[in-house]
């Protein structure tokens, strides 16, 4: 499922800087994981150890044109054809986008909690259910404040259970 950049801007409550048309199919928080730059929306997350804004120039050179930022980079003239979606909190914007995406699907979602064994149980359920239905599951151990929204983004029109 793809969203227009206009729709994403509305869904996350951003102020858009840039006017390029774009359809977003992929979300990115780690510049090392780029696969489809023309359809990617990069969230410049900030943490104690890192600032996603420092990867914008590199990602732009690699073909990404759509960015969610809390701080617009200097020298916008160096980014022709780019869209910057300005928000107060990029993590909150990522979570909000995933929440709105989830609202598009009236399917059952299985949540697994506990201290140990969540990934193993998730994989067992996938093996049990996937022969008879289309299952979308989180890749790896995506169970953090960043991983859950990225997992929810994988839901699509064919998904019967997540």
Regions found by a protein language model. Name each.
Residues 1-96:
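N-terminal leader/targeting and accessory segments in enzymes
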């Amino acid at each position: 499922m793809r969203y227009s950049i206009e729709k994403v801007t509305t869904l996350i409550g951003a102020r858009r800087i840039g006017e390029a048309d774009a359809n977003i199919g992929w979300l990115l928080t780690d510049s090392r994981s780029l696969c489809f730059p023309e359809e990617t929306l990069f969230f410049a997350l900030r943490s104690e150890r890192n600032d996603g804004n420092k990867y914008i120039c590199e990602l732009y050179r690699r073909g990404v044109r759509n960015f969610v930022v809390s701080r617009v980079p200097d020298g916008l003239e160096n980014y022709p054809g780019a869209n910057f979606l300005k928000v107060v909190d990029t993590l909150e914007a990522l979570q909000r986008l995933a929440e709105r995406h989830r609202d598009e699907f009236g399917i059952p979602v299985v949540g697994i909690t506990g201290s140990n064994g969540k990934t193993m149980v998730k994989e067992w359920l996938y093996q049990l259910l996937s022969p008879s239905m289309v299952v979308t599951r989180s890749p790896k151990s995506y169970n953090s404040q960043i991983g859950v929204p990225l997992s929810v983004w994988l839901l699509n029109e064919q998904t019967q259970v997540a």
